[in-house]
Amino acid sequence: MGDFLFPIDSGAALAIHVALSAGIVAAIIGVAAVLREKRAGARPDTPYEGGVLPAAPPQGPQNAPYFLIAALFVIFDMEAAILFAWAVAAREAGWVGLIEAAIFIGVLLLALVYLWIDGALDWGPGERK
């Protein structure tokens, strides 16, 4: 279908795509650099907190169990992406593909049970093991 609309070599099409993508990115960065508000005395090494200076310097490491939950979400979200790809090719994969998918799900369920028993999913106030 692509040859009907634009008879072009696939390598040239890739080069055009990369060049246009890089040009769009450069244009967006250039427009942002021109239009941004320039402030005298702005410190680029301080975090942005709604336009005000930070209240106090950090007092040490922060307890942030959210990052653990986010990492677990990313790990187990990949399971869904892989299983969606398997579902598309389930007929061609046959019984072997079904068994492989079941083993994959089983390993991830074992990992989830291990994390649950280990207390990695307990992120409220309370005792951890």
From Swiss-Prot:
<dbReference type="InterPro" id="IPR023043">
    <property type="entry name" value="NAD(P)H_OxRDtase_bac/plastid"/>
</dbReference>
<keyword id="KW-1278">Translocase</keyword>
<keyword id="KW-0874">Quinone</keyword>
<keyword id="KW-0813">Transport</keyword>
<protein>
    <recommendedName>
        <fullName>NADH-quinone oxidoreductase subunit A</fullName>
        <ecNumber>7.1.1.-</ecNumber>
    </recommendedName>
</protein>
<dbReference type="InterPro" id="IPR038430">
    <property type="entry name" value="NDAH_ubi_oxred_su3_sf"/>
</dbReference>
<dbReference type="GO" id="GO:0030964">
    <property type="term" value="C:NADH dehydrogenase complex"/>
</dbReference>
<feature type="transmembrane region" description="Helical">
    <location>
        <begin position="14"/>
        <end position="34"/>
    </location>
</feature>
<keyword id="KW-1133">Transmembrane helix</keyword>
<dbReference type="GO" id="GO:0048038">
    <property type="term" value="F:quinone binding"/>
</dbReference>
<comment type="subunit">
    <text>NDH-1 is composed of 14 different subunits. Subunits NuoA, H, J, K, L, M, N constitute the membrane sector of the complex.</text>
</comment>
<keyword id="KW-0830">Ubiquinone</keyword>
<keyword id="KW-1003">Cell membrane</keyword>
<feature type="transmembrane region" description="Helical">
    <location>
        <begin position="97"/>
        <end position="117"/>
    </location>
</feature>
<dbReference type="GO" id="GO:0005886">
    <property type="term" value="C:plasma membrane"/>
</dbReference>
<dbReference type="GO" id="GO:0050136">
    <property type="term" value="F:NADH:ubiquinone reductase (non-electrogenic) activity"/>
</dbReference>
<comment type="function">
    <text>NDH-1 shuttles electrons from NADH, via FMN and iron-sulfur (Fe-S) centers, to quinones in the respiratory chain. The immediate electron acceptor for the enzyme in this species is believed to be ubiquinone. Couples the redox reaction to proton translocation (for every two electrons transferred, four hydrogen ions are translocated across the cytoplasmic membrane), and thus conserves the redox energy in a proton gradient.</text>
</comment>
<comment type="similarity">
    <text>Belongs to the complex I subunit 3 family.</text>
</comment>
<dbReference type="GO" id="GO:0008137">
    <property type="term" value="F:NADH dehydrogenase (ubiquinone) activity"/>
</dbReference>
<feature type="transmembrane region" description="Helical">
    <location>
        <begin position="67"/>
        <end position="87"/>
    </location>
</feature>
<keyword id="KW-0997">Cell inner membrane</keyword>
<keyword id="KW-0812">Transmembrane</keyword>
<dbReference type="Pfam" id="PF00507">
    <property type="entry name" value="Oxidored_q4"/>
</dbReference>
<dbReference type="InterPro" id="IPR000440">
    <property type="entry name" value="NADH_UbQ/plastoQ_OxRdtase_su3"/>
</dbReference>
<keyword id="KW-0520">NAD</keyword>
<keyword id="KW-0472">Membrane</keyword>
